[in-house]
Swiss-Prot record:
Protein name (record): Adenylate kinase
Compartments in which it is found: Cytoplasm, Cytosol; Mitochondrion intermembrane space
Residue ranges of the TM segments: none
Propeptide: 2
Keyword Disulfide bond (UniProt): no
Notes on the domains: Consists of three domains, a large central CORE domain and two small peripheral domains, NMPbind and LID, which undergo movements during catalysis. The LID domain closes over the site of phosphoryl transfer upon ATP binding. Assembling and dissambling the active center during each catalytic cycle provides an effective means to prevent ATP hydrolysis.
C-alpha cells in the first residue's frame, strides 16, 4: 500500500450517527488502526500498564482520566501498535479544546500530524428515532434496529441466535440529554478543526453506502 493511501484522522459524530459502521470501513480500506478511546482505556487497564493503573485509580474514585494520560495512551498506540503505521482513525477523542491542542502538539512532535477531522452530521430527531430502536448483541457488538435493520428472528442475533439487548441509556430522555451534552462539548472542537483547515462535514442521515462514498470523497481518496 502506498503512503498516499495512509490516513490520519479524527472521526466526530453524535451517538447514533454511524461511527460504529464507518470506522471499520475506514480501518479496512486504509489498513489503519481504529483508536477508540474507551477501548484503549480498557485495554491499558487490562494489561496493567503504568498508564492503565493510573487511569484505573482515577476511575475507581469516580474521576475523569486526565488529558495527559489520554494523549500518552494514544502516543503509546502510535509507538507500539503495528496497525498505526498506515495511520489511525481516532474515535471519541478529543472532546475538549485543551485535549485537541495537546493531541496536535504530540502528533506534530511524532511527525504524524492530523490530516482530516470528519464530522458525521445528523438531526437530533432522526438520531432519537435511530437509537431508541437499537438492539445490541453484547458478545460481538453487532447492532440491529427494530425498524431500520431488524434481526431475522425477533430479538435474536442472526449469527448465534443469542438474545439481543436494548441498552438502558438508549431511551429517548436519556438520549436527548446525551445529545445536548454532545453538542455543547463538540461544537468548540469542530470550530477548532475548521480554523486549522482540516474539518469536513458529511451528511450522515443518508444510507450508509452514500455516507461512505461521501467520506472517501472528503478524504480525497474516492
Amino acid at each position: 500500500m502506498s503512503s498516499s493511501e495512509s490516513i490520519r484522522m479524527v472521526l466526530i459524530g453524535p451517538p447514533g450517527a454511524g461511527k460504529g459502521t464507518q470506522a471499520p470501513n475506514l480501518q479496512e480500506r486504509f489498513h489503519a488502526a481504529h483508536l477508540a478511546t474507551g477501548d484503549m482505556l480498557r485495554s491499558q487497564i487490562a494489561k496493567g500498564t503504568q498508564l492503565g493503573l493510573e487511569a484505573k485509580k482515577i476511575m475507581d474514585q469516580g474521576g475523569l482520566v486526565s488529558d495527559d494520560i489520554m494523549v500518552n495512551m494514544i502516543k503509546d498506540e502510535l509507538t507500539n501498535n503495528p496497525a498505526c503505521k498506515n495511520g489511525f482513525i481516532l474515535d471519541g477523542f478529543p472532546r475538549t479544546i485543551p485535549q485537541a491542542e495537546k493531541l496536535d502538539q504530540m502528533l506534530k512532535e511524532q511527525g504524524t500530524p492530523l490530516e482530516k477531522a470528519i464530522e458525521l452530521k445528523v438531526d437530533d430527531e432522526l438520531l432519537v428515532a435511530r437509537i431508541t430502536g437499537r438492539l445490541i448483541h453484547p458478545a460481538s457488538g453487532r447492532s440491529y434496529h427494530k425498524i431500520f435493520n431488524p434481526p431475522k428472528e425477533d430479538m435474536k442475533d442472526d449469527v448465534t441466535g443469542e438474545a439481543l439487548v436494548q441498552r438502558s441509556d438508549d431511551n429517548a430522555d436519556a438520549l436527548k440529554k446525551r445529545l445536548a451534552a454532545y453538542h455543547a462539548q463538540t461544537e468548540p472542537i469542530v470550530d477548532f478543526y475548521k480554523k486549522t483547515g482540516i474539518w469536513a462535514g458529511v451528511d450522515a442521515s443518508q444510507p450508509p453506502a452514500t455516507v461512505w462514498a461521501d467520506i472517501l470523497n472528503k478524504l480525497g481518496k474516492d
